[in-house]
Amino acid sequence: MARVTVEDCVDKISNRFDLVLMAAQRARQISGGAELTIDRDRDKNPVVALREIAEQTVTPEELHEAVVSTLQRVRVDDDDAPDEIGSLAASAEALRLTAAAPPRNQNIGGDYE
């Protein structure tokens, strides 16, 4: 296959910056052992990723979700239930009590005679 350029892929993913992020994500997936959707033809992983995008063997939506999930620092679990109002009020009260300033020492200046 001829050299793959950004122009071959830009009609699939219009934003060049998104294209770079998604191609890099796909190249990392390939490096991690993901199955190729096209023949490698002695190309390196970034070129294979661009060829897959150009030939539409991977969808931009899948790549976008993969990019977003890798950039998230905190992953939301389905098991996590939202806190109840009572526990929120108790948490706020506990925070108020722990954040209160300690009582000031009334003996200013030390123990001098």
Swiss-Prot record:
Gene Ontology BP term (one): DNA-templated transcription
Gene Ontology CC: DNA-directed RNA polymerase complex
Gene3D superfamilies reported in the protein's UniProt record: 3.90.940.10
Pfam family, one: RNA_pol_Rpb6
EC number: 2.7.7.6
Root EC class: transferase
Cysteine disulfide partners in this protein: none
Record keyword Nucleotide-binding present: no
Statement: the UniProt record of this protein carries the keyword Transmembrane helix: no
Superkingdom of the source species: Bacteria
Coiled coil: none
Keywords, comma-separated and alphabetical: DNA-directed RNA polymerase, Nucleotidyltransferase, Transcription, Transferase
Molecular function GO labels: DNA binding; DNA-directed RNA polymerase activity
Catalytic activity: RNA(n) + a ribonucleoside 5'-triphosphate = RNA(n+1) + diphosphate
Subunit structure: The RNAP catalytic core consists of 2 alpha, 1 beta, 1 beta' and 1 omega subunit. When a sigma factor is associated with the core the holoenzyme is formed, which can initiate transcription.
NCBIfam families reported for this sequence: rpoZ (TIGR00690)
Biological role: Promotes RNA polymerase assembly. Latches the N- and C-terminal regions of the beta' subunit thereby facilitating its interaction with the beta and alpha subunits.
Protein family according to the UniProt entry: Belongs to the RNA polymerase subunit omega family.
Protein name in UniProt: DNA-directed RNA polymerase subunit omega
Organism: Rhizorhabdus wittichii (strain DSM 6014 / CCUG 31198 / JCM 15750 / NBRC 105917 / EY 4224 / RW1)
Lineage: Bacteria, Pseudomonadati, Pseudomonadota, Alphaproteobacteria, Sphingomonadales
The encoding gene: rpoZ
